[in-house]
């Protein structure tokens, strides 16, 4: 049986090592389970063919770096379209004939974030929808077709989806839950870093849209971090850093610097999956604020980045989305609701790093391990 990993967001963003790392955890987990897996990556063409070729080259280079050469088929779609016709795509890494032969036999598609669309979608035998962002997916499923009529199973990392306190838009689909994947064979625990650096990696500005109480609020990191920007003054013995896409001439940089935050370019420190892992390992812990709607709606969402930090033996300080109840009591997390709790959490990590680091790694192995979660999703 062939397991296809359907993805449409790794190749097109070649500066995003963290972005690429998401499907990478899935693929490495499938390999650990000794399954016949193929990474199926969709790359829509742009007007810049030279840039497209650079994206293709980078995608191939990253797969080779992780021992996955020959285990992928990149579907280059020219022109780009919201519908996916295999006849209109060029297959790279695997011939179209070989792909069709695989599709003719028993197969499963793990469709990450609805990356693969109809009519190509109908060629897979068993189609599993894997939701990585419940607040957006559940909201937009109430507005448009997002694969809800064309998949056999639906899985979400919204761990709290079935509880009464979860305020995600109602869905008639039978959702099952899984944890964000971290390949704990790739992500090994690292020694204590020299610096007490609390950091995170992400996008300071956000272009998405989710309606909350009739409005479309700004859910960017810029807004979500605002209540916590006084932390460097409260805990001067710690260093606070943000690997965020803030341009050098953006006034936000100067404002954050005045408040004690060091801003670094994520394209410099986390451009590849390897450098992304190295940057996380350089941290004492992760500190981050998350999309407010996940907190307000109590979705139970946790980030794949947090899972990776844990696997590396790095504690995580973040806001609670209702996910805490689905974790072991000792888990390496410190969940917070305001700056006072954040200050206490940072001081806890500074005082008890060794113990929290052990708890973080143990939780990653027990809960977030890629092979463990894939075994559950695929019912192995």
What does each of the following model-derived ranges do?
Residues 13-19, 24-25, 31-45, 219-222, ...:
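Catalytic binding pocket for nucleotide-activated donors in carbohydrate/polymer assembly enzymes
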Residues 4-10, 40-44, 200-208, 244-245, ...:
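Short loop/turn segments at strand-loop or loop-helix junctions that form parts
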Residues 38, 128, 153, 199, ...:
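A structural signal for isolated positions on well-ordered beta-strands in alpha/beta enzyme cores
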Residues 118-124, 148, 164-169, 252-258, ...:
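Short loop/helix-cap segments at secondary-structure boundaries that form the rim of catalytic
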Residues 121-128, 135, 170-188, 312-314:
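P-loop/Walker A phosphate-binding loop and immediately adjacent motor/lid segment at beta-alpha junctions
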């Amino acid at each position: 049986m062939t397991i296809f990993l359907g993805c449409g967001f790794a190749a097109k963003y070649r500066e995003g090592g963290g972005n690429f790392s998401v499907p990478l955890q899935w693929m490495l987990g499938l390999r650990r389970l000794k399954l016949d897996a193929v990474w199926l990556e969709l790359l829509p063409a742009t007007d810049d063919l030279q840039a497209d070729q650079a994206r293709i080259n980078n995608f191939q280079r990253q797969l080779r770096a992780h021992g996955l050469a020959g285990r992928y088929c990149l579907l280059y779609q020219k022109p780009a379209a919201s519908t996916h016709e295999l006849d209109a795509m060029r297959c790279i890494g695997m011939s179209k004939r070989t792909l069709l032969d695989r599709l003719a036999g028993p197969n499963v598609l793990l469709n990450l974030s609805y990356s693969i669309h109809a009519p190509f979608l109908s060629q897979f035998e068993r189609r599993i929808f894997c939701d990585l962002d419940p607040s957006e997916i559940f909201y937009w499923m109430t507005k448009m077709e997002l694969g809800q009529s064309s998949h056999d199973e639906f899985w979400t990392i919204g761990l709290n989806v079935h509880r009464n306190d979860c305020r995600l838009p109602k869905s008639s689909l039978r959702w099952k839950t899984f944890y964000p994947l971290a390949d704990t064979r790739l992500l090994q625990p690292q020694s204590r870093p020299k610096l007490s650096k609390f950091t995170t990696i992400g996008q300071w500005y956000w272009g998405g849209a989710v309606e909350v109480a009739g409005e479309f609020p700004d859910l960017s990191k810029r807004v979500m971090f605002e209540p916590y920007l006084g932390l460097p003054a409260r805990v001067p013995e710690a260093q606070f850093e943000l690997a965020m896409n803030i341009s050098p001439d953006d006034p936000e940089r100067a404002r954050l610097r005045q408040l004690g935050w060091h801003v670094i370019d994520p394209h410099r420190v986390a451009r590849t999956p390897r450098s992304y892992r190295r940057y996380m390992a350089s941290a004492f812990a992760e500190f981050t604020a998350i999309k407010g709607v996940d907190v307000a709606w109590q979705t139970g969402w946790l980030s794949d980045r947090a899972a990776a930090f844990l696997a590396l033996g790095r504690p995580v300080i973040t806001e609670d989305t209702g996910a805490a109840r689905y974790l072991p009591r000792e888990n390496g997390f410190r969940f917070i609701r305001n700056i006072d709790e954040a200050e206490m959490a940072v001081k806890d990590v500074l005082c008890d790093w060794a113990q929290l680091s052990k708890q973080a790694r143990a939780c990653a192995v027990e809960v977030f391990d890629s092979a463990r979660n894939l075994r559950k999703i695929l019912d192995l």
